[in-house]
Amino acid sequence: MKYKLLPCLLAILLTGCDRTEVTLSFTPEMASFSNEFDFDPLRGPVKDFTQTLMDEQGEVTKRVSGTLSEEGCFDSLELLDLENNTVVALVLDANYYRDAETLEKRVRLQGKCQLAELPSAGVSWETDDNGFVIKASSKQMQMEYRYDDQGYPLGKTTKSNDKTLSVSATPSTDPIKKLDYTAVTLLNNQRVGNVKQSCEYDNHANPVDCQLIIVDEGVKPAVERVYTIKNTIDYY
């Protein structure tokens, strides 16, 4: 047995053998886009992905698909929200994301490929020194975002008129299982909901299958909904 291990040990020393390196951190673009477009962030050299949310009856309620460059920029992003009857399809063109059908300029970018402005809604984004979006503002609202040391989104606080909505997420202490998390939602400091998610992961530490439990505590009795999330991911 010892002799059989020698070739691989030697290969590890010389070339690293044939193993996948796990990237534990999230890029500023991936983390920030996941905040704004409401999907689970992914790690590593993602080439394209599709994230599908299904209800307890197996019906698709939401789907997010994206393609990324080797540098981690979103070349395209498509969102299908059946619950709200919304479809958004964006394609990268220099410093803008254009509508995939009308080619209208929808989102202005800053830096390499980070969010800067949504002109039609009067929304502008601010980034920190590391390139993560930490603020979004318009005439009607102010939003602040939080991240941990690995760039994982820890939640956001939205202020609009006399209302403050805060979402705080607590991920697993296992750095591989960041998408196993709990979250609490507060409206004007009153708890109105909670979320729990647990996942199975691939060898890039990205979620493949997840169960998402959402509890609406703003109604009495509280209403619990259970969803399944399926991820299809291709890598460079």
From Swiss-Prot:
A Pfam family it matches: UPF0257
Superkingdom of the source species: Bacteria
Predominant subcellular localization, coarse grouping: membrane
Family that this chain belongs to: Belongs to the UPF0257 family.
One Gene Ontology cellular component annotation held by this UniProt entry: plasma membrane
Covalent lipid sites (N-palmitoyl cysteine): C17
Keywords, in A-Z order: Cell membrane, Lipoprotein, Membrane, Palmitate, Signal
Signal sequence, renumbered to the chain: 1-16
Lipid moiety-binding residues (S-diacylglycerol cysteine): C17
Membrane topology: Lipid-anchor
Subcellular localization(s) per the UniProt record: Cell membrane
Protein name as annotated: UPF0257 lipoprotein YnfC
Species lineage: Bacteria, Pseudomonadati, Pseudomonadota, Gammaproteobacteria, Enterobacterales
InterPro entries: UPF0257
Species assigned in the record: Escherichia coli O6:H1 (strain CFT073 / ATCC 700928 / UPEC)
HAMAP family associated with the record: UPF0257
